UniProtKB/Swiss-Prot annotation:
Gene3D superfamilies with a match to the protein in the record: Alanine racemase (3.20.20.10), Lyase, Ornithine Decarboxylase, Chain A, domain 1 (2.40.37.10)
Cofactor(s) this protein requires: pyridoxal 5'-phosphate
MF annotations from Gene Ontology: alanine racemase activity; pyridoxal phosphate binding
Family of the protein in this entry: Belongs to the alanine racemase family.
HAMAP family assigned: Ala_racemase (MF_01201)
Record-listed E.C. numbers: 5.1.1.1
Pathway(s) the chain acts in: Amino-acid biosynthesis; D-alanine biosynthesis; D-alanine from L-alanine: step 1/1
N6-(pyridoxal phosphate)lysine modification, residue list: 33
NCBIfam families: alr, PRK00053.2-2
Entry-linked InterPro entries: Ala_racemase, Ala_racemase/Decarboxylase_C, Ala_racemase_C, Ala_racemase_N, Ala_racemase_pyridoxalP-BS, PLP-binding_barrel
Functional description taken from the UniProt entry: Catalyzes the interconversion of L-alanine and D-alanine. May also act on other amino acids.
Naturally occurring in which organism (per UniProt): Campylobacter jejuni subsp. jejuni serotype O:2 (strain ATCC 700819 / NCTC 11168)
UniProt-recorded name of the protein: Alanine racemase
One of the record's GO cellular component terms: cytosol
C-alpha cells in the first residue's frame, strides 16, 4: 500500500521556529483545514497541542469535530450559517447579511475585506456591521483578514496592512479584548507582527515558505511487480516510453486516483530517489526503473508543482485521505 510518512521532529522544529518568530506558542493559530493541507490533521493535532498550541483553524464543522478533543479554541473559516451552530466552536462571519442566520450566543470572528475581495466586510461598512452585531446576541470575540499578496513584492500587502489597522481602530471603540489575526504563512517572515495580534500559519508549519524550515511530508509507494523490459519494448498506455536498452523496471502502487497529477509520459518527472517515471501514469500505479520494495515518490512538493505548473498547496491537498499516514 502507498504510504505518507510525517516527520515528527521536522514538524516540531518548524513550530518552535515559528513560535520564536511570533513570540510564543500562545499567539500561534495553526491552520488544519483540508486535512492539515494533506498531512493528516488527527495525526498532527496531538503534536501541536503538546508543544503548547491551543488555537487552530479549520474549514468546516466536520473538520472541527475531528480534532476538538485537542484544542481549546477552534475557528471555522468557511461556514454557511444554518442556525444550529455548536457553541464549542468559533465561527467566521464572512458576510454581514448572514448575521440573522447564525444561532444566537455563539462566538464569532469578523472577517474584514482589506483588499482581497473574496470574503468579509469592507472597512467602509464596518461600523454598520458592528451595529448589526450589537443588535444580535452573537458574541464577537475576534477580527481578522487575509493578505492576498503577502508573497508578492508589490505595494498591495502594505495597503492591506494599513486597512486592517484602520479596522482595528474602529472596532476598538466598541469592543475590548478582541483577538486580532491578519498575518498568514506568506506574511510571517515579511516583518514584525503587531503586538496585539496572533498569527495564522498554514503551509509554513509543514516546511514551505522559508529556507530555515524542514519539509514534513514524504510520499512512498510499494512494488507490485517487476520485469525485464527489453530493448524496443514499450511500457504503459500508449507506449509513450520505449526502452533504448534492456532494463529492469517495476510497477508501484500509486496512481492518479490517489490524488496525484496524471503524468502523461512527456518530459522527465523525477521521483524522490532520482529515478524518472516511465510512461504514462495509470489510475492506480506507475512504472520506473526497479528501485526495490519501497520507493520515495517525493519529499518536496515544489518539484512536482514546478513540473505540473501549479503550486505546492495543490500537490499536497489533493493527496487522498485514504492513503495511510504515519509518524516517523
Amino acid at each position: 500500500m502507498s504510504l505518507i510518512k510525517i516527520d515528527q521532529k521536522a514538524y516540531e522544529y518548524n513550530l518552535r521556529h515559528i513560535a520564536k518568530k511570533i513570540g510564543s506558542f500562545q499567539r500561534l493559530i495553526c491552520v488544519f483545514k483540508d486535512n492539515a493541507y494533506g498531512h493528516g490533521a488527527k495525526l498532527l493535532a496531538p503534536l501541536a497541542k503538546n508543544l503548547g498550541v491551543s488555537f487552530v483553524a479549520v474549514k468546516s464543522e466536520e473538520e472541527a469535530r475531528e480534532i476538538e478533543e485537542f484544542f481549546e479554541n477552534i475557528l471555522i473559516l468557511s461556514h454557511r450559517p444554518h442556525g444550529n451552530e455548536n457553541s464549542r466552536f468559533i465561527y467566521a462571519l464572512n458576510d454581514i447579511s448572514q448575521v440573522k442566520n447564525y444561532k444566537q450566543d455563539i462566538k464569532i470572528h469578523l472577517k474584514i475585506d482589506t483588499g482581497m475581495h473574496r470574503n468579509g466586510i469592507c472597512v467602509e461598512n464596518l461600523e454598520h456591521a458592528i451595529n448589526l452585531i450589537q443588535g444580535s446576541d452573537l458574541k464577537l470575540t475576534g477580527m481578522f483578514t487575509h493578505f492576498a499578496s503577502a508573497d508578492e513584492m508589490d505595494g498591495s500587502f502594505f495597503v492591506q496592512k494599513e486597512n486592517f489597522q484602520k479596522a482595528k481602530k474602529i472596532v476598538k471603540k466598541y469592543f475590548s479584548n478582541l483577538l486580532f489575526h491578519s498575518y498568514n504563512s506568506a506574511a510571517l517572515f515579511r516583518g514584525k507582527i503587531p503586538e496585539d495580534e496572533y498569527c495564522r500559519v498554514g503551509l509554513v508549519q509543514f516546511g514551505y515558505g522559508d529556507s530555515n524550515l524542514k519539509r514534513v511530508l514524504s510520499l512512498y509507494a510499494h512494488r507490485l511487480s517487476q520485469r525485464i523490459l527489453q530493448k524496443g519494448q514499450s511500457i504503459g498506455y500508449g507506449g509513450i516510453f520505449t526502452a533504448a536498452k534492456d532494463m529492469e523496471v517495476a510497477t508501484y502502487d500509486l496512481g492518479y486516483a490517489d490524488g496525484l497529477f496524471r503524468y502523461n509520459g512527456r518530459g522527465e518527472l523525477v521521483l524522490g530517489n532520482g529515478k524518472a517515471m516511465l510512461g504514462k501514469m495509470s489510475m492506480d500505479s506507475f512504472s520506473c526503473e526497479n528501485s526495490g520494495e519501497e520507493i520515495c515518490v517525493f519529499k518536496d512538493a515544489d518539484i512536482w508543482a514546478d513540473f505540473f505548473h501549479t503550486i505546492n498547496y495543490e500537490i499536497l491537498v489533493k493527496l487522498n485521505p485514504n492513503i495511510q499516514r504515519v509518524l516517523v
